[in-house]
Regions:
Chain A
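Transmembrane alpha-helical core residues of multi-pass small-molecule transporters
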Residues: 11, 19, 107-108, 135-138, ...
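N-terminal signal-anchor/signal peptide hydrophobic helix marking the start
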Residues: 6-16
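Membrane-interfacial helix-loop-helix junctions in multi-pass membrane proteins
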Residues: 50-57, 73-83, 167-170, 265-275
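Alpha-helical transmembrane segments of integral membrane proteins
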Residues: 2-3, 94-127, 143, 168-313
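Membrane-water interface segments at the C-terminal ends of transmembrane alpha-helices
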Residues: 23-29, 65-67, 133-162, 180-184
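An internal, D/E-rich "acidic patch" concept
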Residues: 55-113
Length: 313, 362
């Protein structure tokens, strides 16, 4: 097991390194650069390039970048925020996005599980149908449409929640965006939980448990959920990454200074900000790889078939 | 509630079950009667889909949710630990009541496929102990000791160590032994074995059958075997119920069924059994396939596949004709007015051989 973990961590780091390199080269060869040519003369641009080290060979630039990165230094923006250190800007954005995304994950998973379990336990009855319809709507309606709907009813018609994100009333003003972001996760988790549970409830081992007299909540908890939840972890992982890395449109509509908004600014601002694009790309990838790693390890904890090797004595 | 027979422990009376499916209603069980006496072994034999498993699942409250019991009774003589005795109709009990009072404690089941019938996320020790801890006042240590004992009883070596194994670490035969240990953990009166050896290879099959037989005599269990394997039936059963399309078409003790079968379907089943001495180079199989019970045919459901079918078979379902006190068969051939029909010669020769062989062992 220890060996397996080390191997997985090593592979993850290697993957990340490759991603950073590809990103690094890609931003430089793709169209667009950090300098708005209509406002800068050729000379100014050349000076700026030299200042940023962009005139050096790509591999040298990469080496410089990596040495700084390994010290935890993302560098400065090439055009955005007048060259403020990326770390500081990123910190605020990450904290905003993570808190709103985290709340969305909590709501989505908890309510989704609850809906899925309710549907599975009432298979074929009204509640099951209701949950199915709900999940289809939840998967189909984009979160920002739902956000606008919520804003209309709960900020305008009944003024309970603020119209826009307010960093000073953090918890209160993150409710609307979190709820609208959670809808997709909620529906996906609900649908998946329901289907997995129904399958497990039809399995031979649940029949055997019943035939030895297990029933009710013990049967559901110990035999049905325990087995149904294992595959749910897999669908949950990418959903978590999606939510943590911010939602472009929702952040824009609700005026949240999050990662999503930062990404849009980095690409579609005054010019393409190489360092921001890179920093955000690394963040996305690291999160994704990290969560996948956690899921793989969690699988081992949840599923003895992976943890304990076959016939192992 | 009264039982017909005072020695009986389980009596199924006129059980009738329909399944609701998207395609329509399937009349899967059509008036089944079955008797089980204490200490006896009864087999239910039939092709896939004849309703063998459904009958026993209904009797233990494990029927799939789309199954509807139209009528019938499953009477069980429930003996409690304090010696009190009561005849209960299992079909009248709620699921919860069944699980609490009956499943595991009185009626336990062994399923067909040991590869899928154990919970993959639970060690086998806790799986055996689970029922005990729920039902009895045994402490965890006592339940554990009892579980180890049971594992030894079903012939698992290194029982103490195996308690911590997960199902995937055991072979098919071992898993089936664990399933049997689980079934025995509640000290049941009746053990229902639903094709317990179908998924196992032949050498293991024989061992598992021996094990069940051995435990049966030691613990005084009554056993119901659900199987399509007449070889298994011949080895273990006292009484045999031959089931076809949701009806029991012939019932008798094992000698009557094997040496004096009366129903053409039983003839077919016996002829289809592989046999070393048969001179034919082809193995007989019953022509056609079981009827689709979505569209219940009028008359005898077996008639279209029956070479000996009479005209009346197309119009009316035959009643059970009595041949002896223990032997009944539902075929119009037994009607006094029916033409006398000789057994197919190959089968006749075969039954003769079987009888002689049996005599040699007596």
């Amino acid at each position: 097991m220890k060996k397996y973990v080390l191997k997985r961590v090593g592979m993850s780091l290697l993957t990340l390194l490759i991603i950073v390199f590809v990103l690094f080269v890609l931003v430089r060869i793709m169209p667009g650069n950090p300098f708005p040519s209509e406002r800068m003369s050729a000379e100014q641009i050349a000076n700026k390039r030299a200042e940023l080290g962009l005139d050096k060979p790509v591999l040298v630039q990469f080496w410089d970048y990596m040495t700084k990165l390994l010290q935890g230094n993302f560098g400065k923006g090439t055009s955005l925020y007048n060259g403020a250190p990326i770390k500081t800007v990123l910190k605020t954005a990450v904290s905003n996005s993570f808190r709103i995304g985290g709340l969305a994950i909590l709501i989505g998973t908890a309510v989704g599980l609850l809906l899925g379990i309710t549907a599975a336990l009432n298979r074929g009855k009204f509640l099951d149908g209701f949950c199915t319809v709900f999940s289809i709507i939840g998967v189909c309606v984009p979160s920002y449409v739902f956000l606008i709907f919520l804003q209309y009813y709960f900020s305008y018609k009944i003024p309970v929640f603020p119209y826009f994100f307010d960093i000073n009333r953090f918890a209160f003003s993150s409710i609307l965006p979190s709820v609208s972001l959670s809808l997709f996760t909620m529906s996906t988790v609900a649908r998946f939980t329901r289907n997995e549970m129904v399958e497990v409830m039809d399995s031979d081992y649940v029949r055997l448990a019943e035939s030895k007299g297990i029933y009710g909540s013990r049967l559901v908890r110990r035999h049905v959920l325990r087995n149904a939840l294992i595959p749910i972890v897999t669908v949950l992982a990418p959903l978590i990454v999606d939510l943590l890395t911010g939602a472009l449109v929702v952040e824009k509509i609700y005026g949240i200074n999050g990662i999503g908004k930062l990404m849009v600014d980095a690409i579609a601002g005054e010019g393409v900000d190489y360092n921001y694009v890179l920093a955000l790309g690394i963040l996305y990838s690291a999160l994704y790889i990290g969560i996948m790693l956690v899921v793989d390890l969690l699988y081992g904890v949840l599923d003895p078939r992976i943890r304990v090797s076959a016939r192992g004595d | 509630m009264e039982m017909l027979n005072e020695k009986a422990i389980l009596e199924i009376r006129d059980l009738d079950i329909t399944f609701r499916t998207n395609a329509g209603s399937i009349h899967a069980i059509r008036g089944v009667n079955l008797d089980l006496q204490k200490g006896e072994t009864v087999a239910i034999v039939g092709e896939s889909g004849s309703g063998k498993s459904v009958t026993m699942k209904a009797a233990t409250g494990l029927l799939d949710s789309n199954g509807v019991v139209n009528r019938g009774q499953v009477l069980y003589r429930c003996r409690e630990a304090d010696g009190s005795e009561e005849v209960v109709d299992l079909l009248q009990m709620s699921k919860k009541e069944l699980r609490r009072r009956i499943n595991g404690r009185h009626i336990a089941m062994v399923f067909q496929d040991p590869m899928t019938s154990l919970d993959p996320t639970m060690q086998i020790g806790p799986q055996i102990m689970e029922g005990m801890l729920l039902r009895t006042k045994l402490s965890k240590a006592e339940a554990r000791a009892r579980a180890v004992e049971l594992l030894e009883l079903v012939g698992i070596t290194d029982a103490e160590k195996r308690m911590k194994s997960y199902p995937h670490q055991l072979s098919g035969g071992m898993r089936q032994r664990v399933v049997i240990a689980i079934a025995l953990s509640g000290d049941p009166d009746i053990l229902i074995c639903d094709e317990p050896t179908t998924a196992l290879d032949v050498t293991i099959q024989a061992k598992i059958l021996e094990l069940i037989k051995d435990i049966q005599s030691r613990m005084g269990l009554s056993v119901i075997y659900i199987t399509h394997d007449l070889g298994v039936v011949a080895k273990v059963a006292d009484y045999v119920n031959v089931m076809y399309a949701g009806r029991i078409v012939e019932v008798g003790n094992v000698n009557e069924i094997f040496y004096e079968p009366q129903h053409p379907y039983t003839w077919g089943l016996l002829s289809a059994m592989p046999d070393l001495d048969t001179e034919d180079d082809r193995l007989y199989s019953i022509p056609g396939s079981p009827p689709n019970l979505l569209h219940e045919p009028p008359g005898d459901a077996f008639a279209p596949r029956n070479a000996f079918a009479l005209k009346i078979d197309e119009k009316a379902d035959p009643p059970l004709f009595k041949i002896s006190d223990t032997h009944y068969a539902a075929t119009w051939l037994l009607h006094p007015d029916a033409p006398k029909i000789e057994l197919p010669p190959e089968l006749k020769a075969r039954l003769e051989r079987a009888r002689k062989e049996a005599e040699r062992y007596l």
